[in-house]
């Protein structure tokens, strides 16, 4: 993801107008029969075909009515789409959009795509509108849609003086150039995500216990650090995440176990992974 965002900001230094969109319900709308056909045509090793087709046909487990209701509420339909979260999901998305990517390449558009998020760098507002028409027509051939252009929706046009958002990062004007950094909204999302670990209810709902708590929390933090290593304020992000880790751990042990953190010795703090 960081490579895609870095490519986008590099291209914006050449073409300052930005067209950004998000394919509507992409993974849920993938036509499985079309995907199976693409797998058979594009994957050379036939021995892999059945395995890949089986993976693409997987459904979300519904062990009880409550889980089934949640799945239905998300709009996930059986026998349609590819389930997000699988290691192969990005591979399937690239296979399914292969013809679209070729059309973009043939049209010589300066596009960066990451799964269902895409951004095209342009030289003018009119070019952005032309790109919008092109993308709609090309994606329609795959049975896919994108939202209409608006100032606050998922399809937007950004002028050279505006910060363009892509993959949770901002392509921010910085003098005559552009820099890549976290948007205020994404910083807040990260903060809320980490602070969820201080709620016992959240932990129980997500099968996090005393034995895997530290590993789960560190995994989420490591994911953010890996994804946003290209940010201009990466050092500040590291400090913020360290502070949130400490806050979560202190809050959890204080509120859940009534531990007086201030009375703990340095070894006790270290055992609970709390900075002294």
What are these regions (language model features)?
Residues 151-153:
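The conserved 3'-phosphoadenosine-5'-phosphosulfate
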Residues 1-6:
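Well-ordered mid-protein domain cores that form the structural environment of catalytic cofactors
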């Amino acid at each position: 993801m960081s490579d895609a965002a870095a490519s986008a900001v590099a291209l914006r230094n050449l073409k300052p107008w930005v067209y950004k969109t998000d394919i509507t319900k992409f993974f849920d709308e993938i036509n499985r029969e079309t995907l199976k056909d693409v797998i058979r045509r594009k994957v050379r090793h036939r021995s892999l075909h059945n395995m890949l087709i089986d993976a693409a046909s997987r459904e979300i487990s519904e062990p009880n009515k409550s889980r089934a209701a949640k799945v239905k509420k998300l709009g996930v339909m059986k026998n349609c789409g590819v389930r997000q979260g699988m290691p192969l999901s990005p591979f399937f998305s690239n296979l399914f959009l292969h013809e679209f990517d070729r059309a973009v390449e043939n049209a010589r558009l300066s596009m960066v795509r990451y799964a269902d998020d895409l951004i095209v760098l342009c030289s003018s507002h009119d070019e952005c509108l032309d790109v919008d028409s092109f993308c709609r027509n090309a994606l329609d051939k795959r049975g896919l849609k994108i939202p209409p252009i608006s100032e606050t929706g998922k399809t937007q046009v950004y002028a050279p003086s505006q910060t363009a958002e892509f993959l949770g990062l901002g392509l921010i004007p910085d003098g005559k150039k552009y820099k890549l950094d976290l948007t205020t909204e994404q910083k807040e999302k990260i903060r809320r995500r980490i602070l969820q670990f201080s709620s016992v209810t959240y932990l129980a709902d997500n099968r996090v216990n005393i034995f895997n708590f530290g590993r789960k929390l560190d995994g989420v933090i490591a994911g953010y650090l890996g994804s946003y290593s290209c940010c201009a304020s990466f050092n500040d992000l590291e400090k913020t995440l360290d502070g949130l880790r400490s806050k979560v751990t202190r809050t959890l042990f204080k509120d859940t176990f009534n531990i007086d953190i201030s009375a703990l010795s340095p070894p006790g703090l270290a055992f609970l992974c709390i900075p002294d």
